[in-house]
Curated annotation (Swiss-Prot):
Keywords: Amino-acid biosynthesis, Aromatic amino acid biosynthesis, Lyase. This is 3-dehydroquinate dehydratase. Its EC number is 4.2.1.10. It catalyses: 3-dehydroquinate = 3-dehydroshikimate + H2O. Catalyzes a trans-dehydration via an enolate intermediate. It is an enzyme of class 4 (lyase). Belongs to the type-II 3-dehydroquinase family. The lineage of its organism: Bacteria, Pseudomonadati, Pseudomonadota, Gammaproteobacteria, Pasteurellales. SUPFAM superfamilies: Type II 3-dehydroquinate dehydratase (SSF52304). Substrate binds at residues 77, 83, 90, 104-105, 114.
Length: 149
């Protein structure tokens, strides 16, 4: 890669509680540990990753808007906003940055209201049910995607 690519790792509401919150669904690894692993991968691949987590929709939207023409790829776990946020979807579409949707748990094995996503049909891909490893797979997909650009 001739240029240093920039990736934004976005995490939505309640993901700051990973490791303590419902480990049956989300595992026992903290968000900080996931971010550290992604930063290690970023160093190995000579890319820059910014990690951002917010419990409010507006802060996530603002971060997406700030990424316009600044970021090459977004990795996003919208958490509960997956099923409710047209505004986050519209923000992602507005900036035209390719993204992968990530979920720690298999949302299709859970409550029916979790089966619908406002992001899946506009994402480059969706990874769910693979726990923290899903973030690594999403990162590696982003590397492959950016290498082909």
């Amino acid at each position: 890669m001739s240029q240093t690519h920039r990736i934004l790792l976005l995490n939505g509401p309640n993901l700051n509680m990973l490791g303590a919150r419902e480990p049956k669904h989300y595992g026992s690894i903290s968000l900080e540990s996931i971010e550290e692993k992604i930063q290690t991968l970023a160093t190995q691949h000579n890319v820059k990753v910014e990690c951002f987590q917010a419990n409010s929709e507006g802060k996530l939207i603002n971060k997406i808007h700030e990424s316009f023409q600044q970021v090459d790829f977004i990795l996003i776990n919208p958490a509960a906003y997956t099923h409710t946020s047209v505004a986050l979807r519209d923000a992602l579409l507005a900036v035209s940055i390719p993204f992968v949707e990530i979920h720690l748990s298999n949302v299709h094995k859970r409550e029916p209201f979790r089966h619908h996503s406002y992001f899946s049909d506009v994402a480059e891909g969706v990874i769910c049910g693979l726990g923290a490893k899903g973030y690594e797979f999403a990162f590696l997909f982003a590397m492959d995607y950016l290498a082909k650009k």
